[in-house]
């Protein structure tokens, strides 16, 4: 896998960066909670590349003003522009599964895809799926494809997902 190959050729210089990445680039608090959230998000990203189809149920959502660098931050984490996409507009788009292929971090910019979903259940079902079953154009049969991407969200407002009574 090209992302695995890229990651495995990197050498760590001993500098701790994960603990302070959101503080440095997004102005977040330097709390243990923020550190754990970022660490968990990055561990899910790595897991999806090394173990396609593994559980990755959470989505890191950044809230901030227009131009705060939310999308730039996620693009930076993807390491390569080809491994990032912010073009996820609707969860019910027939070509969505083709679009997921080849991308590592899929940003729901301004949470448009989530807002356009019919319900929280539809959002949860889409985000927590471990594989997608679809037929490529001109193929005869559908195939199961294990997910290798994770999802990230960005919005300018804190009111981006409808209230969920289940708490999940």
Language-model regions, residue ranges each:
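P-loop NTPase catalytic core of nucleic-acid-dependent motor ATPases
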Residues: 1-105
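Terminal, non-catalytic protein-protein interaction segments that mediate quaternary/complex assembly
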Residues: 4, 76, 119-125
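AAA+/SF3 P-loop NTPase mechanochemical coupling elements
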Residues: 96-101, 136-154
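Conserved nucleotide-binding/hydrolysis micro-motifs of P-loop NTPases
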Residues: 112-113, 156-160
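Conserved catalytic/switch belt of AAA+ P-loop NTPases
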Residues: 120-143
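A short helix-turn-beta junction within AAA+ P-loop NTPase domains corresponding to the substrate/partner-engaging
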Residues: 161-168
